[in-house]
């Protein structure tokens, strides 16, 4: 493991805007890829006559390996800059990308938003159905404030490398982000060409008009979020493995608090208690884990069948909250008709996904000011923001957003789409026996 400070990065943006190529380029220039993997990807791309897509092939290759090789550590994609050690926590292009973005974004310290400057592509991303808009809204709701906007495909503008087009995109995307409450001092824009690496790790000869930092230099300007080590322990579980000769190994990211070898932890909602025998991160044994660490930890006293993805490990004296009902502020992103009381979408929160029924529409609010505009509305439609009450259909750990951000923000999914996103304001706890 690198001794540099570690940041988790998510790469977002509309389909076909060049996310994979950009990630591949970063990994190739600054990453942990060996020549062999790169060569194989180049050959695979050549065979299919898609030379320019070798980076995307590279990612597919890595993804396959990740899906095949079940190891304790979460072998995310990693690269280093002068200042930081980065983990890319989701390679885009995934069917479940929005859902992953919500469960994954709870882990991201910053985002690279890839926006194509090509005529037609940029407009598609910013249309009502476009993922550029959707991902911007999601990033904000999920608490990602640091965003680097990589305006890609600058070689395909008309004329090529057009400064005017770049400025137009900066202006429009900037206005949109500002309207959703982004602090624009933490949002940076850089014109890039992903396949050639222009303005990614090296300066572009073709865009002399741009004198700002490269993407890599902007990555080095990111700020490290403070570690919430003083809060009670919370580790949402991503996977649970049973490893011969070791025992039960839950895997997850420490969101708050500190986990030490020898600690007793409780898994909620089941209420089972286990003792931590060892902790690993990226194949390295460690004595204690802090917020931001992706770990596998071996526990004694718990069986594999007792715990599952979506459970949360926490401290015994302040155990994770199991919700009987919770109050949330939501934004309806997309719904074909309207959302009313009784509507039951699947709520994706931290690593869990559980259907939750809306039991009350308390008030409709202005998303930009947060002020109430209507009491007890009959229904909500796309674009509306509201305070609602929700009841999980089965046991679910939910925390207040202001106390445990990663366990208090969620997405609502239905019909294969993200219907809305929200943050938890209050929780009515359910009594769970700790055994």
Swiss-Prot record:
It comes from the Archaea. GTP binds at residues 13-20, 90-94, 152-155. SUPFAM superfamilies: EF-Tu/eEF-1alpha/eIF2-gamma C-terminal domain (SSF50465), P-loop containing nucleoside triphosphate hydrolases (SSF52540), Translation proteins (SSF50447). Residues 13-20 are annotated as: G1. The keyword Hydrolase applies. Gene3D superfamilies: P-loop containing nucleotide triphosphate hydrolases, Translation factors. The keyword Cell membrane does not apply. Its EC number is 3.6.5.3. Residues 4-229 form the tr-type G domain. Pfam families: GTP-eEF1A_C, GTP_EFTU, GTP_EFTU_D2. GO terms for cellular component: cytoplasm. Residues 69-73 are annotated as: G2. It is found in: Cytoplasm. Residues 152-155 are annotated as: G4. Residues 193-195 are annotated as: G5. Keywords: Cytoplasm, Elongation factor, GTP-binding, Hydrolase, Magnesium, Metal-binding, Nucleotide-binding, Protein biosynthesis. Belongs to the TRAFAC class translation factor GTPase superfamily. Classic translation factor GTPase family. EF-Tu/EF-1A subfamily. GTP hydrolase that promotes the GTP-dependent binding of aminoacyl-tRNA to the A-site of ribosomes during protein biosynthesis. NCBIfam families: EF-1_alpha (TIGR00483), PRK12317.1 (NF008969), small_GTP (TIGR00231). This is Elongation factor 1-alpha. It comes from Sulfurisphaera tokodaii (strain DSM 16993 / JCM 10545 / NBRC 100140 / 7). The lineage of its organism: Archaea, Thermoproteota, Thermoprotei, Sulfolobales, Sulfolobaceae.
